[in-house]
Structure formats: structure tokens, C-alpha cells
From Swiss-Prot:
This is Pre-histone-like nucleoprotein. The record marks 23-24 as: Cleavage. Cleaved near the N-terminus by the viral protease during virion maturation to form the mature protein. The keyword Hydrolase does not apply. GO terms for molecular function: DNA binding. Induction: Expressed in the late phase of the viral replicative cycle. Interacts with the core-capsid bridging protein; this interaction bridges the virus core to the capsid. Interacts with host NPM1; this interaction might play a role in placing the pre-histone-like nucleoprotein on the viral DNA or regulating viral gene expression. Interacts with host HMGB1; this interaction inhibits host immune response. A motif (Nuclear localization signal) lies at residues 125-134. Residues 40-62 are annotated as: Disordered. InterPro entries: Adeno_VII (IPR004912). One of its GO terms (biological process) is viral penetration into host nucleus. Plays a role in the inhibition of host immune response within the nucleus. Interacts with cellular nucleosomes and immobilizes the host immune danger signal HMGB1 on chromatin. In turn, prevents HMGB1 release out of the cell and thus decreases inflammation. Also plays a role in the wrapping and condensation of the viral DNA. May also promote viral genome import into the nucleus.
Amino acid sequence: MAILISPTNNTGWGLGTHKLFGGAKQKSDQHPVYVQAHYRASWGSKGRRRRQGRARGAPLDPKTEAEMVATIDEVARNGPPAARLVLEAARRVGAYNLRRARKLTPAGRAMMAMRARQMVKQAKKRKRRVRFRQ
């Protein structure tokens, strides 16, 4: 159950994730923020669920995207040291978040367990091959 705090007088919003109404579930012109997350009480439930039906931003046109990538690459190659440090830190943080996400989600944990089983199986096959060759 999500407990929401309304900024005014509790009109237009319900309590609970499946009982929200009045634009609280989706962004709109009348409700510019995702109300369920924005006005959640600090002592309310906090899930790690991903929001469904979230609108993506408009995709960049290929020319702009190519210019952006070229600029980042240029800074990474011969930009000022501070800018290079920022880019390197961003890469490390992104890699950390990727590794962490695998541990947090059930699907990620299952994927890691499957990968570990595959590696063990490969190691056993290699061991058998070496034993038969001798």
C-alpha cells in the first residue's frame, strides 16, 4: 500500500497503488509530476518496482546524436584533465550500477546463477578433456 500526502486537501487522489485516480498514476498536463512517487510519505512503502507505461523523451535525430558522441569522444581524448576525470567517474559509476542491478532483481540473480552453472559445466568439460588426452 502506498501512502500519499496530498499537497492540498486530499482531493482527487486515492490511497493504495491500485486505487489511485485523478491523474495520480500517469503524468498529464494537470498533473505534471508522477504523483505516486513525488508525494509519497517518507514513512510509506518504498518498492523497487519499475513504473509501467513511462513515456520516453523524444529521440535525438541521428546528426545531433552523432555530434554529441563525437564531442564526448573528443573530450575523452584530449580535453582538460578535470573533464576526463568526470567522464571516467561516470563510466565507473555506470558499471557499478549495472553490477549492483544484477544482484538486486530476481531476474538478475537468476541470470547470475545460470552463468555460474555454465562456467562450472565448462570447467568440468575442460578437466575431462585434459584427463583423456594424457
